[in-house]
């Protein structure tokens, strides 16, 4: 499973990523995603290995992706770059800053964990709305050219339901 770590600047994403991946924290600001595989130690598997003595023991793994910080003031092109990285993960881990440090300023206008969460939620919902609206438009254009397949008709109905949820400020899942 690939888990993307997503959050505003200076929230501690890379610090948490380093701890989960078992690598030293270098403190650098990244513009590209960093990916590491973390082996999940399981004592039950160790016990079974002692009992059955297999040729090798394969532990479960998690793939962590440290997505660059999401800058609320960035232009659309930069935001899209981050959203494309998000599309390549199976799950999102939102990292919200809940510590105070005078040396590390809060992201502009997002000084409480609730404000940070709402800002990220809003950005994700807006992005999902753009994707859904674009797909609905493409389906409607195709409908004018040729008769839609039953699958395309179901997709358009489903996208309409998803669009309604997003417009109400809810995630689709």
Question: Where do the language-model regions lie?
Answer:
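Conserved G1/Walker A P-loop phosphate-binding module
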Residues: 1-101, 108, 114
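Conserved C-terminal guanine-recognition region of P-loop GTPase G domains, centered on the G4
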Residues: 52-58, 71-173
């Amino acid at each position: 499973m690939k888990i993307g770590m997503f959050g505003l600047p200076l929230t501690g994403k890379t610090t948490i990523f380093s701890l989960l991946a078992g690598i030293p924290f270098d403190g650098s600001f990244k513009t590209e995603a960093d990916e590491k595989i973390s082996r999940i130690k399981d004592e039950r598997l160790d016990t079974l290995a002692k009992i059955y003595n297999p040729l090798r023991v394969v532990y479960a793994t998690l793939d962590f992706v440290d997505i660059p910080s999401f800058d609320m003031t960035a232009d659309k092109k930069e935001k899209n770059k981050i959203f494309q990285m998000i599309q390549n993960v199976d799950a999102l881990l939102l990292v919200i800053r809940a510590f105070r440090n005078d040396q590390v300023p809060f992201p502009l206008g997002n000084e409480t964990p609730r404000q940070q969460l709402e800002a990220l939620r809003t950005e994700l919902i807006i992005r999902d709305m753009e994707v859904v609206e674009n797909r609905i438009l493409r389906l409607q254009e195709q409908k004018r050219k040729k008769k839609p397949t039953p699958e395309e008709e179901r997709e358009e109905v489903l996208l309409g339901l998803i669009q309604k949820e997003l417009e109400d400020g809810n995630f689709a899942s």
